[in-house]
């Protein structure tokens, strides 16, 4: 009788264990340190992906870290403090030189300008001669300044150039220490607003569209990609989801609110920057790849660097653009 009871108890316990749900193993998200610049163009995908849960769906937790420009972002990646970064057009020359790889297009921008003061006697590009002009080295705005000088048959020797960081450009321009400066959004619109209209855009990316395409991209170091190519593909997949949301004009106000929160600025300021680029969807990016236009755009960008003397010789765009990653992430 005791043996029978023991058998019955064993069977009962087995049945109970069979129906008790086993708690799912908790998988900790991969924490990524992601570099950005404080503007809409740099943040529209990152903040959308965070707030819509696209990155968490891919197993990531993003820690956003602010930088002033692309070259300093790449330097931070090289010292190991940043995993993934966003860069504007100017820093692409560092990718061409082998310091990083582009794993996804972000957008084609129009955020750079040479800003000038009317009080300094500037109304056209030739008026830059003899003027104090500020710029941030290695940025896309420096390229716009270079093109402006070329169009006016001027050289760097014809102006009084001052190399500064982004925040110094803004304050120096407003104080009158500079007569003109090469900068980018949101500083461009802020200079107009805070100067009471004295400061204006002398020229922008659009004025030089025949020579340069203002490509803005997501980048990673070669070594990081070799170790974590699957991680980068998943990250790109989340970017694509963010594109499909953020590229819809009806969602601009929501994205602008998220950008404003991250930058601690007014929503209206972020919303005013939605004209700084053409915001692509996932299909837009794929169409550019499949048609060969994206490769040609990056080549055009590279040729503009060669023409300006920023790089010495042309290299295949496939050396630094990870087209396969962009394609695979869309599957």
Where is each model-derived feature located?
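Pocket-lining segment of extracytoplasmic ligand-binding domains
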Residues: 89-90, 162, 168-261
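Predominant activation on well-ordered alpha-helical scaffold segments within soluble catalytic domains
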Residues: 47, 93, 146, 189-192, ...
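Secondary-structure end/capping motifs
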Residues: 226-310
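Short polybasic/polar patches that bind polyanions
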Residues: 56, 150, 193, 261, ...
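Short, glycine-/small- and polar/acidic-enriched structural segments
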Residues: 25-165, 172, 179-185, 200-202, ...
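Short amphipathic alpha-helical segments at helix boundaries and their inter-helical linkers
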Residues: 82-84, 175-177, 277-294, 327-331
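Conserved C-terminal helix/tail region of periplasmic/extracytoplasmic solute-binding proteins
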Residues: 298-331
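Short, low-complexity disordered leader/linker segments with a strong preference
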Residues: 1-31, 329-331
